[in-house]
């Protein structure tokens, strides 16, 4: 049994000290990438503990939503258009996760969001029933969890509580994320930032897929999963600094490229440990007020970044 498995098997899971210890173990030891069902269950359980997601009655709630059938034709067609393209070229994902599973989860989310909207109190962030990219956000959860209801429960926690501003109709949180990516790159690598700016390449042009999907649009998926291990532990705001790390890793190719925009459309395969090391190292260079914006822009719809 690993240190992580030993820790999560003990009773006081949600005590502050236990969470701190679990976060440290994620940083120092990490979770292995494995096809083994027990390892898959461990990762899902760790994500559940770190995000403080209750799985109580999750299967019953999921089945109740499934009984409602497909959502409206408009939403259902949007879902179908995207799920058919989800990680099409990744055989490991396709072998483990069916398109039907993606459709079921996203359809349930559309229904649950409509139900929440009917009960909405004034001031709650209006998460959309479906926005493009939700399929790619859901994919790592279905890939990593041993059951659909568990993946769905984590997905709702992620969407409603952890990154709600990214999933509004106008994607205002993701747009703020793009502005923060520009600002962070300017601080960390002024030369690369100026080069991209001179070529009229703002983060809103090249960075939105990685921002909106929390880097799950990048390859390979097993390395994305390791990034998510870290972000469940330390916060999904770290994704912005991870995207900066992707750019810094590519900088020499970007400078030499005749078409940097094409190069930036798909980041190359990466090693998660290296991206995490770089991203964590950048924190010391980021002014406190900018770091606070990185943290808050995921959940605060009123943040304005010029």
UniProtKB/Swiss-Prot annotation:
Stretches that traverse the bilayer: none
An annotated GO BP: mitotic spindle orientation checkpoint signaling
GO CC terms in record: Bfa1-Bub2 complex; cytoplasm; mitotic spindle pole body; spindle pole; spindle pole body
Keywords of the record: Cell cycle, Cell division, Cytoplasm, Cytoskeleton, Mitosis
InterPro entries: Rab-GAP-TBC_dom, Rab-GAP_TBC_sf
Cross-referenced SUPFAM superfamilies: Ypt/Rab-GAP domain of gyp1p
Residues in Rab-GAP TBC domain copies: 37-235
Compartments where found: Cytoplasm, Cytoskeleton, Spindle pole
Quaternary structure and partners: Interacts with BFA1.
Family: Belongs to the BUB2 family.
Biological function: Part of a checkpoint which monitors spindle integrity and prevents premature exit from mitosis. This cell-cycle arrest depends upon inhibition of the GTP-binding protein TEM1 by the BFA1/BUB2 complex.
Name of this protein: Mitotic check point protein BUB2
Organism, scientific name: Saccharomyces cerevisiae (strain ATCC 204508 / S288c)
Higher taxonomy: Eukaryota, Fungi, Dikarya, Ascomycota, Saccharomycotina
